[in-house]
């Protein structure tokens, strides 16, 4: 009786392990899962940050700062959604680093927004340079994924 129970338990365990292996996320599957999330964020940023460069040039720093803060909130939401997507185990280290850069981008957008609202244009410009550098580092992590919308390009808006 104990042998039969042990065999059934082992068989069930092997079946579960096989299902887990079959359900392992692939790089292609990951890209398919995250691109719509990034697309939504990109489209939101196009609306939110569309005229921000002109606002800053015209000295309208408070509205530009408000736009940066909205973009920060959108990116933080996107970052949380991206973190919830199962990752391919072979790419977990790269994706973990990429997600940390994405999270940092949200913080930098927020810092730049606060600086603009406070009338600190030079400080905001310095933060935007840091933001662009951070985005480049993030993109380097996932170059092999051939992302379209998940390639972060803050320079399009700033």
Explain the meaning of each model-derived region.
Residues 1-8:
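Bacterial N-terminal signal peptides that target proteins for export
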Residues 9-17:
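Bacterial N-terminal signal peptides
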Residues 17-30:
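C-terminal region of N-terminal signal peptides and the immediate post-cleavage residues
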Residues 27-111, 123-152:
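Alpha-helical segments in soluble extracytoplasmic regions
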Residues 156-158:
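Short, solvent-exposed mixed-charge patches
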């Amino acid at each position: 009786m104990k042998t039969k129970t042990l065999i059934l338990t082992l068989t069930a365990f092997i079946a579960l392990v096989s299902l887990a292996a079959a359900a392992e996320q692939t790089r292609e599957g990951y890209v398919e899962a995250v691109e719509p999330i990034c697309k939504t964020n990109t489209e939101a940023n196009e609306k939110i940050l569309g005229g921000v460069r002109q606002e800053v040039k015209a000295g309208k720093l408070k509205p530009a700062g408000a736009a940066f803060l909205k973009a920060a909130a959108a990116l933080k939401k996107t970052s949380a959604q991206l973190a919830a997507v199962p990752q391919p185990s072979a790419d977990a280290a790269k994706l973990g680093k990429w997600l940390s850069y994405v999270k940092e981008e949200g913080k930098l957008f927020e810092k730049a927004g606060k600086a603009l609202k406070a009338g600190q244009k030079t400080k905001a410009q310095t933060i935007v340079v840091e933001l662009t550098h951070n985005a480049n580092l993030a993109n380097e992590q996932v170059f092999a994924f051939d992302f379209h919308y998940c390639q972060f390009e803050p320079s399009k808006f700033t």
